[in-house]
Swiss-Prot record:
Protein species of origin: Stereum hirsutum (strain FP-91666) (White-rot fungus)
Lineage: Eukaryota, Fungi, Dikarya, Basidiomycota, Agaricomycotina
Keywords associated with the record: Calcium, Cobalt, Lyase, Magnesium, Manganese, Metal-binding, Nickel
PANTHER family the record matches: BETA-PINACENE SYNTHASE-RELATED, TERPENE SYNTHASE
Protein name in UniProt: Delta(6)-protoilludene synthase STEHIDRAFT_25180
A GO BP annotation: isoprenoid biosynthetic process
Sites where the protein binds Mg(2+) 2: 89
Protein family: Belongs to the terpene synthase family.
Length: 351
């Protein structure tokens, strides 16, 4: 398929046309969204204009699509986590590497000390993190708590590296980009939420097949998210950390060529995931096998959830997301660097 018909218009491929996990949303979505959104807004992290744009992104929808089978309490954990992610994301996007290093240190200190008051003059992300984790650990096993903190430290350090790349205008190649993107996307701590009520031992989660399935789902999430976010990111001059720009630079191709490359790469990942899911899962006995099945299905569902949210929220396509999901053609936005901390408003553009 030709994915660009002019320099100003391009086609967004549907990489999940045959993905077997359908859209599924948690029945507690509206109720938990109300509570988590009010909690996130209570910190005053953004100015009114940016807060309005942030709310339109509906990160609670992402959590409700990603955790459709979780209880109301654990869905609240997922919603709070998504909101916490994107507070850090929006601040780090416009901060110097030095400031992002400090933000990451504050977050990790708050995770390790959820009952200790934060300094009054500290960056707001510290208190957001502390409150999130203090509530989350009430419904998480000890193993899940440990894994979450380990995964979140890797995530924060990758965001620091991303800030350094941005500061130096450094464009990675595909392999090194995906290696870092697997961390910056936040999938690893997000996957731990799937385990919070499970008793899976470390040796199960460290098994090569489980690790491969986790990596494959993460890569598909990365590619899908980068496809959706590319237009907004290139418009605000923040597209160096995006697979479309990476592929264009490495292979000397245009947007059409980059989209074609991503489609083919995504298809390989999809085939590998489905083969392992259908043929490669070991058995750990009648007590653990149902948990493993639920966890791996959660990985597959996360791929669908991320893609659906990209179109159903207003983060990347404004109010036109559902229309674009159907027609797939979009106009390339004109470059305009965002001035405010917070998601870029896109409804005024001719998407």
């Amino acid at each position: 398929m030709t994915v660009v018909d002019s320099p100003q218009r391009f086609y967004i491929p549907n990489c999940l046309e045959y993905w077997p996990w359908p859209r599924h949303i948690n029945p507690h979505y509206q109720e938990v969204k109300k509570a988590s959104a009010a909690w996130a807004e209570s910190f005053g992290a953004f100015n009114p204009k940016a807060q309005h744009a942030y709310n339109a992104c509906d990160f609670n929808l992402l959590a409700s699509l990603a955790y459709p089978l979780e209880s109301e309490e654990r869905l609240r954990t997922g919603c709070d986590l998504m909101n916490m992610f994107f507070v850090f994301d929006e601040y780090s996007d416009v901060s110097s590497p030095k400031d992002v290093i400090q933000q990451a240190a504050i977050i990790m200190d708050a995770l390790r000390n959820p009952y200790a008051p934060r300094p009054d003059d500290e960056w707001v992300g510290g208190e957001v993190t502390r409150q999130f984790w203090k509530r989350a650990i009430k419904t998480a096993t000890a193993g899940a708590q440990r894994r979450f903190i380990d995964a979140f430290e890797s995530y924060t350090q990758s965001v620091v590296q991303q800030a350094k790349d941005r500061h130096h205008g450094f464009i990675r190649d595909v392999d090194s980009y995906l290696e870092m993107r697997r961390e910056t996307i936040g999938a690893k701590p997000s996957f731990v939420v799937l385990q919070m009520d499970m008793t899976l031992p470390d040796e199960v989660l460290a098994h090569p097949v489980i690790q491969q399935l986790s990596a494959l789902s993460t890569d598909m999430i990365c590619l899908g998210n980068d496809i959706c976010s590319y237009n907004v990111e290139q418009a605000r001059g923040d597209d160096l950390h995006n697979i479309i720009t990476i592929a264009m630079n490495q292979f000397d191709i245009d947007i059409a060529g980059a989209m074609d490359w991503v489609v083919k790469y995504h298809a390989k990942l999809e085939r590998k995931f489905l083969y392992l899911y259908n043929n490669g899962l070991p058995s750990w006995g009648k007590e653990l096998d149902p948990q493993v099945e639920r966890y791996v299905c959660g990985l597959g569902n996360w791929v669908r959830a991320s893609d659906q949210w990209g179109f159903e929220s207003e983060r990347y396509f404004g109010k036109k997301g559902k229309e674009i999901f159907k027609r797939r053609w979009v106009n390339l936005m004109q470059p305009e660097r965002a001035q405010d901390i917070g998601p870029t408003l896109v409804d005024g553009t001719r998407l």
